[in-house]
């Protein structure tokens, strides 16, 4: 069974349950540069945050947190991590797509992503989002290594597969109707 993406609304009890694993993933990735427990808790429990998690059965294997930006209608992807043992399977995209759908439902139409350059994530973000992505700040130094800031136009149906083409009565292909 493929890993499942779930929305989580954080409160103090949820943080006590999931916070340690989120911090573990953060420290695995960033070592001494990892966000502090206080910062991670603020990100997850902020009332304006959107938190999505990825699970392999009972094991939390990834999460994404988006929070408010300084501009109306825009959010920032504050954190996104996948357990190193699960990387390379495309799990980050359904996770971010779930964040997008939740943001869209709240009226947010843009998501800023500070994407790491060194591991190829910045290039992958641009490739994945195509015309919905605009580089707003080229590769620049940060405490986390070189990053590229990419603004993504949020889509209501982010991550949903397009309907397959169907055959018309005349035998030609036509796209299935979508709304």
Each model region followed by its residue ranges:
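Short coil/turn segments at alpha/beta junctions that flank glycine-rich nucleotide-binding fingerprints
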Residues: 33, 89, 106-109
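C-terminal "cap" of GNAT-fold acetyltransferases
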Residues: 132-179
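Conserved acetyl-CoA pyrophosphate-binding loop and the N-cap/start of the following alpha-helix
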Residues: 86, 90-98
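A short, internal acetyl-CoA/4′-phosphopantetheine-binding micro-motif in the GNAT/acyltransferase core
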Residues: 80-87, 115-117
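Acetyl-CoA-dependent GNAT
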Residues: 9-78, 83, 96, 102, ...
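Conserved active-site alpha-helix within GNAT-family acetyltransferase domains
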Residues: 117-137
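Conserved GNAT acetyl-CoA-binding A-motif
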Residues: 103-115
